[in-house]
């Protein structure tokens, strides 16, 4: 059992718990196996009636009782719970009557680091002793939840929230999502109910995004994505979801669940909802039928991939949305194939995407700093650094205006700086927003 971990036949995640395991294994001491409880496996020891129990000659130790049972009485104590728990990997599959099973050894054990020796080490020992093999290949140690004072959550301290109350207030999926998001591998978690709001808001975000897409479906839309009609933003988001799938799979393989969830969160919220969906809104208002159709099919494809990635963490929300999105003969999400990204990247103009984001963000920032109300449109003057940049950004003017709530956007490579303007310097352009009636000059 000791060699199995030292030789990496069994891997710990995170690996630093190997040191704790080795410390216990290298310093094993005698273990009192009897407990005075009402439940458990009664100790298989009988004492001859009317004799001195301290004398081993009066003991009968066996897995079967003595033949003259009327002359013996069994020990009242039961075996320590870990004595029976260490048999769990194979005892639940019919052992000792069943010697082989496809479920032994299993791939992974998920447990807490506080029972490394009590349970993990003893299961490894019993696996080799009774089955001649390791019981599992990987051991993932969960984080320990602590309160804001650093104390372990426990009933005795009364500092553990009622999970049912959290479920009713925030939702089951939101609670699970939030706790996993805040639990980095190998680190304890300082639990705060405020953190559960992140999961609730995320579930609401993906629900609203899915609802928006389905409400904008038209019968005239094509059934598939028109590859020839993809623009740079389409290629960017399709490449981004493939990259997300790759990263999430890598994190799952290394049991870095919080990193996987963070990647899902960042892509869905920041890339898909905050940018691509906003672009799609403009297309649904202004685009032609091909643009609208592609926007719908791409958005639907991406949401479904996100739901598949999300399903192990948020099974209820993901299944409900999936049932609204799936095609007539498509399988339920629980038996659908896990998403795999393509090995090749989808070629797109990354600089154009970055410039577009920076310009829109800069205009929004100025609006916020000047406290311009959302209902008021503004004028923007953009000086491109050169004519090449001007040519690249010209086709995006209407989209920039739409996402920045601007009335006019004058783009040129001229360097005349307008007076009395708010300024933002971007990588590709300098932005000027005439203050005019946007601010009170007397203040």
Model regions: which residues?
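Structured secondary-structure scaffolds
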Residues: 1-219, 237-281, 285-286, 297-310
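Short, charged, low-complexity loops and linkers
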Residues: 189-197, 221-232, 249-259, 343-346, ...
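A ubiquitous short alpha-helical element
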Residues: 164-167, 227-237, 291, 348-349, ...
């Amino acid at each position: 059992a000791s060699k199995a971990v030292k030789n990496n036949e069994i891997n710990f995640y995170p690996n630093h718990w190997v040191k704790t395991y080795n410390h216990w294994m290298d310093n094993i001491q005698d273990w009192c196996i009897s407990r005075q409880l009402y439940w458990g496996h009664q100790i298989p020891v009988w004492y001859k009636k009317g004799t001195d129990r301290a004398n081993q000659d009066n003991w009968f130790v066996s897995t079967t009782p003595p033949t003259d049972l009327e002359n013996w009485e069994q020990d009242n104590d039961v075996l320590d719970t870990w004595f029976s728990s260490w048999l769990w990997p194979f005892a639940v599959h019919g052992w000792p009557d069943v010697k082989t099973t496809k479920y032994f050894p299993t791939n992974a054990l998920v447990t807490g680091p506080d029972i490394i020796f009590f349970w993990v080490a003893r299961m490894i020992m019993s696996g080799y002793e009774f089955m001649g093999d390791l019981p599992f290949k990987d051991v993932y140690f969960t984080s320990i939840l602590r309160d804001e004072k650093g104390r372990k959550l426990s009933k005795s301290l009364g500092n553990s929230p009622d999970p049912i109350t959290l479920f009713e207030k925030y939702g089951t999926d939101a609670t699970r999502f939030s706790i996993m998001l805040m639990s980095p591998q190998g680190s304890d978690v300082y639990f705060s109910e405020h953190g559960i709001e992140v999961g609730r808001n995320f579930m609401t975000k993906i629900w609203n995004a899915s609802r928006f897409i389905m409400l904008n479906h038209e019968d005239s839309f094509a059934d598939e994505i028109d590859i020839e009609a993809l623009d740079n933003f389409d290629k960017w988001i399709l490449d981004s979801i493939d990259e997300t799938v790759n990263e999430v799979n890598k994190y799952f393989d290394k049991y870095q669940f919080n990193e996987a969830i963070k990647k899902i969160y960042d892509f869905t919220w920041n890339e898909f909802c905050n940018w691509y969906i906003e672009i799609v809104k403009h297309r649904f208002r202004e685009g032609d039928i091909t643009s609208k159709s592609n926007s719908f099919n791409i958005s639907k494809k991406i949401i479904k991939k996100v739901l598949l990635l999300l399903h192990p963490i948020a099974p209820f929300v993901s299944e409900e949305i999936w049932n609204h999105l799936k095609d007539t003969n498509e399988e339920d999400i629980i038996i659908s194939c896990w998403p795999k990204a393509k090995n090749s990247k989808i070629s797109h103009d990354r600089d154009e995407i970055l410039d577009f984001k920076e310009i829109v963000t800069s205009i929004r920032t100025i609006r916020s700093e000047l406290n311009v109300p959302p209902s008021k449109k503004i004028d923007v003057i953009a000086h491109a650094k050169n004519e090449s940049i001007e040519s690249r950004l010209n086709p995006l003017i209407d989209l920039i205006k739409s996402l920045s709530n601007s009335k006019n956007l004058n783009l040129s490579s001229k360097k005349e700086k307008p007076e009395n303007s708010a300024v933002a310097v971007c990588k590709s352009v300098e932005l000027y927003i005439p203050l005019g009636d946007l601010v009170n000059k007397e203040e």
